Amino acid sequence: MLLKEYRICMPLTVEEYRIGQLYMISKHSHEQSERGEGVEVVQNEPYEDPVHGQGQLTEKRVYLNSKLPSWARAVVPKIFYVTEKAWNYYPYTITEYTCSFLPKFSIHIETKYEDNKGSNDNIFESEAKDAEREICFVDIACDEIPERYYKESEDPKNFVSEKTGRGQLKEGWREAQEPIMCSYKLVAVKFEVWGLQSRVEQFVHKVVRDILLIGHRQAFAWVDEWYDMTMDEVREYERTTQEATNRKIGVFPPAISISDITLPSHSHGGYSSAPSTPLATDAPEFLSVPKDRPRKKSAPETLTLPDPSQICLNVQPGAGNKPSLAKPE
């Protein structure tokens, strides 16, 4: 298992981000979906936990086949999806990703939100005090994103909000920005396959980081669209957008079953921690196969069988009457 803690600061308050996150996830999922591909919402309903109180439980199916690299599409079923389950007791959420086609693969994300600059080094002390983890700051303004996802209108260095006056974030913006909040995400990636574990886990973390960066950039760039919304209004937007997204994707036969996740004993809850983002179309270098690799010859090109007339069947006494092949004398 590879554990990393991501810290993503936003020029918002924790309460503002609660609305912005819901809006961003719904809009992004709808934009990224098309016939046969995208994010299908299976369940989204209130949920009560005896420890954390009122929350929200969501379950989604992320259909990925055409978004997979070509090397992966060759070995997975035609209709392939990942199950996302999330439990939200904002400002604390948990999101889990599993896939029955890859039973040894999982992603587990714990998220906490605070009104600070990402300065709390002990926010996950109880959950990860004995675990070794890397801390990664994600800068929505200055970190590079994959070129195919760049939009000038969603660039925090250029964007200025008409409703809040916030924007044009420059290098070092976190030091003087008010208001500011931080999304702390403890991400555990597990791929227990000998020989591939460390490389695949590193690759998945890179994808997760890109998703977090793109999603948080969009949440801020769309602030004028959601800033005046109430919780009831964003819930209604979420409901209607999810219905439209499900219709856009279409109905799928149960071609591959996804392993059910039983609610943990501590019954966490949450919304989707991040939207889905298409993966690269080429295999990572460590999984690439040389195109001109010579074919190994482990046997002769043709196999010559002996002439049956030159073989007779001998039964030797005392050998348990087991027949043997032998050449005639």
From Swiss-Prot:
Keywords: Cytoplasm, Lipid transport, Lipid-binding, Transport. Transmembrane segments: none annotated. It catalyses: a 1,2-diacyl-sn-glycero-3-phospho-(1D-myo-inositol)(in) = a 1,2-diacyl-sn-glycero-3-phospho-(1D-myo-inositol)(out); a 1,2-diacyl-sn-glycero-3-phosphate(in) = a 1,2-diacyl-sn-glycero-3-phosphate(out). Its main location: cytoplasm. SUPFAM superfamilies: Bet v1-like. Residues 267-329 are annotated as: Disordered. GO terms for cellular component: cytoplasm. GO terms for biological process: signal transduction. GO terms for molecular function: lipid binding; phosphatidic acid transfer activity; phosphatidylinositol transfer activity. It is found in: Cytoplasm. It comes from the Eukaryota. Catalyzes the transfer of phosphatidylinositol (PI) and phosphatidic acid (PA) between membranes. Binds PA derived from the phospholipase D signaling pathway and among the cellular PA species, preferably binds to the C16:0/16:1 and C16:1/18:1 PA species. Belongs to the PtdIns transfer protein family. PI transfer class IIB subfamily. PANTHER family: CYTOPLASMIC PHOSPHATIDYLINOSITOL TRANSFER PROTEIN 1, PHOSPHATIDYLINOSITOL TRANSFER PROTEIN. This is Cytoplasmic phosphatidylinositol transfer protein 1. It comes from Xenopus tropicalis.
